[in-house]
């Protein structure tokens, strides 16, 4: 990965080429990871429904899983090699050992470990009780505990999805994004792309995330519960239990019976709370007024509060006059009644004035930025026009000085020339 140093436009071309290669490698790695997970699901379901009748096909599926895993590990190494080359291009390095840090080596080894975990085709499937059920074990034979853990651990390969989405989003390949992000010190990583899609396509993102979590956790729960005593291992039951747990309702009609099933349900509840919070945030943002609607609403509320203030002030004057009138007539009962109405009118007037003041403060805080922008634009326009007028006046003054200099020079030359009579004498 070493070589001669490339600078300038060649470095930019090489960076773009490396990013394109990274995008293709990440895409193929995700395809191989998804293929391995699909083959793992196929192997588990074939073992459950078909048993030992299809042992040869089960062994063939496990061999295909191993083959896809080997290709996936090669692509992981190639991807990190491209990452090292990209780091060398950005920092002007020649030796790849300088670019390869201990943290990156640990990350590569961890990814190889995560992607290399799979059920190895070394022995025949565990189907001693396939197709038959006894009182001690009401379910047929299924995956062993170790093989089930290895199969479920293959779902950790889904960490490749954010990487592929980041490289496919075009953020890293867009020069405008990179330049503006560098000026504002913004790092374009996975969280930025997640926020970007949450702002542009919130409905699709939440729907895909929710359905993906439901289906994945439902299948994981069914695998964990299939050899339990209760009937929660059926996929139909888990497809009912997971959404109810995800939505934090929990009717209690279907419950997990194993420790792993309870852990899956607990994680599902936590994920449901997080997705519900995201959904509430998206819905709240969608229900907000836009700028034009907010201005119209505030304008109409301003008129409404001003009208209420006038009515409250008029009612206050009316009740004050009636209180004064009945006090002069010494009608204490009517005076007390109008005094109570006068105090109520004072309270109403104060409440309406407070609401009107809060509305004005809110409108001022909304208009501050746009108003400041307009003021700055007007100030810049005024300064530009004043500068141009000053330049014109300076140019005119310079022209007049040149003309005055020419006149003075001409006058001095005429004074220095002798008269003809003096030349004749």
From Swiss-Prot:
The keyword Acyltransferase does not apply. InterPro entries: CaM-bd_dom, CaM-bd_dom_sf, K_chnl_Ca-activ_SK, K_chnl_dom. It catalyses: K(+)(in) = K(+)(out). Keywords: Calmodulin-binding, Cell membrane, Cell projection, Immunity, Ion channel, Ion transport, Membrane, Phosphoprotein, Transmembrane, Transmembrane helix, Transport. The chain crosses the membrane at residues 30-50, 59-79, 105-121, 141-161, 205-225, 263-283. It is found in: Cell membrane; Cell projection, Ruffle membrane. One of its GO terms (biological process) is phospholipid translocation. One of its GO terms (molecular function) is small conductance calcium-activated potassium channel activity. It is a multi-pass membrane protein. Phosphorylation at His-356 by NDKB activates the intermediate conductance calcium-activated potassium channel activity, and conversely it's dephosphorylation by PHPT1 inhibits this activity. The keyword Metal-binding does not apply. Residues 239-259 dip into the membrane without crossing it. The channel is inhibited by clotrimazole and charybdotoxin but is insensitive to apamin. Residues 284-345 are annotated as: Calmodulin-binding. The modification Phosphohistidine is found at residue 356. GO terms for cellular component: cytosol; plasma membrane; ruffle membrane; vesicle. It comes from the Eukaryota. Intermediate conductance calcium-activated potassium channel that mediates the voltage-independent transmembrane transfer of potassium across the cell membrane through a constitutive interaction with calmodulin which binds the intracellular calcium allowing its opening. The current is characterized by a voltage-independent activation, an intracellular calcium concentration increase-dependent activation and a single-channel conductance of about 25 picosiemens. PANTHER family: SMALL CONDUCTANCE CALCIUM-ACTIVATED POTASSIUM CHANNEL. Belongs to the potassium channel KCNN family. KCa3.1/KCNN4 subfamily. This is Intermediate conductance calcium-activated potassium channel protein 4. It comes from Mus musculus. The lineage of its organism: Eukaryota, Metazoa, Chordata, Craniata, Vertebrata.
